[in-house]
Amino acid sequence: MATTEPSVEQLETKTAKLKLENTTKRDTLIELEKKYQQKWQEEKAFEVDAPLEDVPIDELRKKYPKFFGNMPYPYMNGALHLGHAFTLSKVEFTTAFERLNGKRVLFPMGFHCTGMPICASADRLSREIEMFGPSFDVPEEKEEEVEVEVKTPNAREDVTKHSGKKSKAAAKTAAVKYQFQIMESLGVPRTEIHKFADAKYWLSYFPPLCQRDCTEFGLGIDWRRSFITTDVNPYYDSFVRWQVNHLHDSGKIKFGERYTVYSIKDGQPCMDHDRKSGEGVGPQEYTGIKMEVLEFPEAARKALQSIDLSNKKVCMIAATLRPETMYGQTNCYVGPNITYGIYESNVPNELFICTRRAANNMAYQKLSKERGVVSELGTIKGQDLIGALVNAPLSVHKQVYVLPMETVLATKGTGVVTSVPSDSPDDFATLTELRKKAEFYHLNPEWMKYEAVPIIRTPSYGDMCAEFLCKKLKIQSPKDVKQLAQAKELAYKECFYQGTMIIGKYSGEKVETAKPKVRKELIDQGLAFVYNEPEGQVISRSGDDCIVALCDQWFLDYGEASWKAVTEKALDRLNTFSPEVRNGFLKTLDWLSQWACARSYGLGTRLPWDPQFLVESLTDSTIYMAYYTICHLLHSDVYGKVPGALNIKPEQMTPEVWDHVFRQAPKPKNTSISDEALARLCREFQYFYPFDIRASGKDLVPNHLTFCLYTHTAIFDEKYWPKGIRANGHLLMNGEKMSKSTGNFMTLHEATKKFGADATRLALADAGDTVDDANFEEALANSAILRLYTQEAWCKEMMENLDNLRTGPYNFHDKVFENEINQLIESSREAFSATLFKAALKSCFYDLQNARDWYREVTADRKMHRDLVCRWIETQVLLLATFAPHWSEHIWLTTLKKPQSIHVSGRFPQVSSPVNTALSNSLLYIRTLSRVIREAEAAQLKRQKKGKGMLFDPSKPKRLTVFVAEKFPEWQAQYVALLQKYYNESENKFDDKAIISSVDKKEMKRAMPFIQQFKQSVINRGEHVSANSIFSRELGFNELEVLREVKPYLVRNVGIQELRIVLLQKPADKSSAAIGLVESGSDAGATVEIAPNFANTVPGQPTFLFENVSA
């Protein structure tokens, strides 16, 4: 297998934006990474099995806790990119953390090959070989490439269905270029590309590259448990056949006609994984209204004169989502610039007028003369149809006219729109415009004579909601597109959910119940039919613009009431790690129904009971996580060609054996597998299953991940249902969408080559943790290289020079540092446990190093303590092992001289003692002091320039006096009590009216600034700070003692000759100034008067005075 390896220079030209100037440090780190990757491979560091002790599983797990993490196996039609790595990192970080907690961690990965993408690409290559030969010698005139963007409209416009927005990173673009050029962009030499015309060659080429890239990335994967999907692997093939047989036998898989997105070119349904664009788009069901043409205008008669329309019923077909509004039709709209066709329908002597696109859909929905055949008799411009007289089914106005509408789309619906201006803001705005400018549009006013008819009564918008909303939103014309879109959504929701019919036989009924009845009536009377088309544009992997077809097919009956109920139960028990993901599941369960589970083209497993079909790729990938637990015992290679440790042959894995292993059925009577082997299979499954976390992109919630829940509930006992599913957002790069065409793109292999594995991992950890778009910053990855290199050198230097460090009892700064280490251990543990890796990285890397730097600075005059330096290094190594395992392993073994790998003997660090709040508060106080002192100096100089305050020259030797207080002014206590009385903790709000009315008017000037400041301190307090702790006004430490301890540091840091501390003893009153005692300074013990501007000092908020002193 050969790949074209770019040089470092080529890599930096090809990928993203950042060019590395000096790579010595990076190269050193990469050299270490290669060393330890080889070591882990030789030591089989990540290979893990269930314990062999013969005790019940629950006892076994208690004695040997386990953790099983995984992600959807990547598709093998290319190299992994940073988006894959981002999701992989979520599993990697979680499992690495659990390994440090002493658990037996299983992290496997398979290779997905099922479906049509590989076959479609192979077929394209075959055609290109026919065109250009195996060397792909393209004539110069054909070399030009054209880039087009495929835009997918918002998925579902019907508000009765779930809809989701695509993020910035999710928008897909399709490049019109040759497949062999795509292969070259993947690093495949042109001389080898012809081999990929054989679909199965892909299966041998990309899996090894995937494993290489993951290994270079430092992932802790048990590669023994890898496999490829499809019938190429007979063991996995047997597993999938067992799975679908169970679903079929239990009635979960059914056969029948259903509407599905379909590729005419491929001749089969086009499921999510078969699409180049339009993932998540499904069929949109309309009611096709037959508006029989009663009289054509002169222009239309001329255009159609070559077509024999005698004895023919010609119907303009209007597709509507709101059949209940047909009572109020006043006219019909066409796009004047759209070309319409006249097509033979499935009814003899009946012709349809609609767009060609709609006719393509109808031809595969039993609405044409012959399935799959569009019988077009002729075409006509929309302009020529204006003025036609048509029948309006159910309408109060039986016969209406055709009018122009510029906003009618040829790519949506049928191109014909029936107008109901009472309830459609678009229709109302257009009709109003046409009436105003009838002469301009060359329209006969007679064509617009019908007034809007009240159809639906709504509580918010009355009986004519379209007119109401157009006035409310100040819509002046059809060109107010934004406001009309808003009005349309508001009208639809209000009418459907709150509206009541006020006309017709269903008058008095809620719209929700009347809508299907009106629709049925129209269809039963032959006035309408069911019509489907894709909700948005769907482009297949083969480049086909897909339609919706009515197909006889095997489908999974997702949404069936009892199955849905038990799946909802599984969701209730599932840890989704965020409310957005749970809501995504709930919405999917609301709309998800029948899903085609078979196809006729592609790679995969044959349906056991109907082998002409293959199991589709979102069906064979729902419970394979269970297969991970035992596959290393079945086969020793990913293709299943070599039997595994138990020497079991594929044909021995009968349905009864699978049942015994996965469903605890009785031991098969006729199996040739030994009892010991069966017991081993059962033990591996029962010990590791269910999985604890499955990380995935959020785009899989509406399909794969929900299917995963459904299938688990159908096949497994409750105790084996999934425990956790974590979804992440898409990954941007340098703040922009990843795109090969712009160069803002990077494969995983390129990233580890450019930055090294550990630096790449750190940048991915920092990228983000929510379901929103995350961002990989190259600059951060680059800075991580320097940080790791520098820290390694510092750790080595310290451990080699321990004798130069201080020993003996801990002083104040030692205790504060030790406490901060403990605090960061706890915050890191909390973040890791919640899979909040950006927060974990901040605590265990940035904050921990800042803590060390601070400690080094405050102890500069007395040196750091030897024991604490050693503890910090070991803590840093263990905490960072999750993110930077190679770096940590190196220091663990070579600097700390540990005898075993960190993956074997390393454990998440424990606190040396509970976190001391007083020490934490002291540290926060100290770190704030330097900043506040500098601000005070600047403020004093500013006042001095205005002629206020004591003269002071900052360039000369200076003394700083710090004024502190032990008690709050007595007058403030009553207002603190008042604020506490009128504080609502659940809403984090104060009753301002009650507070103001309780304050004496004479006290307003003094009280209100204090009240406002105190309110803000309560409202804006930290997440882990209670309101009571603010109201208590307790510092939690002795301010005077802390100041004494940090005095040497402040003298150095602030650059002063002397630090003087004055304690406020007696507050000022009307007859005398405030009095203070000098606690520290050249005049210690003296009693001094305190100037008024310093007399308002309160505990925790000292005030400062700078003075010049003689050198």
UniProtKB/Swiss-Prot annotation:
Where ATP is bound, by residue?
740
Q: Which reaction does it catalyse?
A: tRNA(Leu) + L-leucine + ATP = L-leucyl-tRNA(Leu) + AMP + diphosphate
In-chain residues carrying the UniProt-annotated modification Phosphoserine: 460
Could you give one GO CC term from the UniProt record?
Answer: cytosol
The protein's GO terms of the molecular function aspect are: aminoacyl-tRNA deacylase activity; ATP binding; leucine-tRNA ligase activity
Similarity section: Belongs to the class-I aminoacyl-tRNA synthetase family.
- Its main localization is cytoplasm
Organism this protein belongs to = Schizosaccharomyces pombe (strain 972 / ATCC 24843)
- What NCBIfam families does the record tag this protein with? leuS_arch, PRK12300.1
Q: Which residues form a coiled coil?
A: none
InterPro entries attached to this UniProt entry: aa-tRNA-synth_Ia, Leu-tRNA-synth_Ia_arc/euk, M/V/L/I-tRNA-synth_anticd-bd, RBD_LARS1, Rossmann-like_a/b/a_fold, tRNAsynth_Ia_anticodon-bd, Val/Leu/Ile-tRNA-synth_edit
In its UniProt entry, what is this protein called? Putative leucine--tRNA ligase, cytoplasmic
Sorted keywords for this record are: Aminoacyl-tRNA synthetase, ATP-binding, Cytoplasm, Ligase, Nucleotide-binding, Phosphoprotein, Protein biosynthesis
| Location of the motif 'HIGH' region | 74-84
